UniProtKB/Swiss-Prot annotation:
One of its GO terms (molecular function) is ferrochelatase activity. CDD domains: Ferrochelatase_C, Ferrochelatase_N. Fe-coproporphyrin III binds at Y12, R29, R45, Y46, S53, Y124. It catalyses: Fe-coproporphyrin III + 2 H(+) = coproporphyrin III + Fe(2+). Pathway: Porphyrin-containing compound metabolism; protoheme biosynthesis. It comes from Staphylococcus epidermidis (strain ATCC 35984 / DSM 28319 / BCRC 17069 / CCUG 31568 / BM 3577 / RP62A). This is Coproporphyrin III ferrochelatase. It is found in: Cytoplasm. Fe(2+) binds at H181, E263.
Amino acid sequence: MTKTIGLLVMAYGTPYKESDIEPYYTDIRRGKKPTEEELQDLKDRYEFIGGLSPLAGTTDRQAEALLEALNKEQDDVNFKLYLGLKHISPYIEEAVEQMHNDGIKEAVTVVLAPHYSSFSVGSYDQRAQEKADEYGIQLTHIKHYYQQPKFIKYWTEKINETLEQIPNQEHDETVLVVSAHSLPKGLIERNNDPYPHELHETAEILKQESNIIHVAEGWQSEGNTGTPWLGPDVQDLTRDLYKEHQFKHFIYTPVGFVCEHLEVLYDNDYECKVVCDDIGVNYYRPEMPNTHPLFIGAIVDEIQSHI
């Protein structure tokens, strides 16, 4: 008899329409409403990238692709999909409640973020676990999947494809900037958090597996909290790398993200490109994983190793 297991896919969430922006931003700021200036700045960023971020639709497609791929691999288990978001409905708690209403007793959770941090993935897991405990639902949490061969293969192929656009004799004048979302430095240090090490390990593996010669690690999209965040910031890093090594070509791989959204389309494709244009170097940013079979397969492989 086929056993039904919940598949709780969790993500940050994004506004679906303009009227969602203020409550969404307020939720991110833990109930503190943004000023008109802050709200307008966010609206301007969305407008700059062509309207509201495509993240919502992409997240849905990623979750559906993951469900389909998992169920193809399993004969004795049928996964049922639930989507839980951090900052907008359907919230994580709503998804777990729906599982309970559907009679789900066991579920696997996975966050659409390849590296583990107690601040990010850990907080999603905690919210899901606290709600699941109310209903006696058993959860298996997937912590990370950056180390999965298919995840590495995806980025290796994209890096090598990008290098093909650059003359061979200029490969030594090319640098790969591997980045993820910055997080508060104090919190990372207090928790002895593995997050920076996992990004470093990703960069090292990509250097080993791809044809790139030079690799640098950076952080991006830090919050405005008045406290130190992980650095160097990718924009500062770009200027420093140019100053020290005179690289001509900069390839940005924001491997901590899994699709094209505001942090990639604005923070990389606009802000980093502005820096590249200013110092007179070439900007490249390979396509994000989105629903690519290698990316989906990496998560499937990680889940299968835990069930």
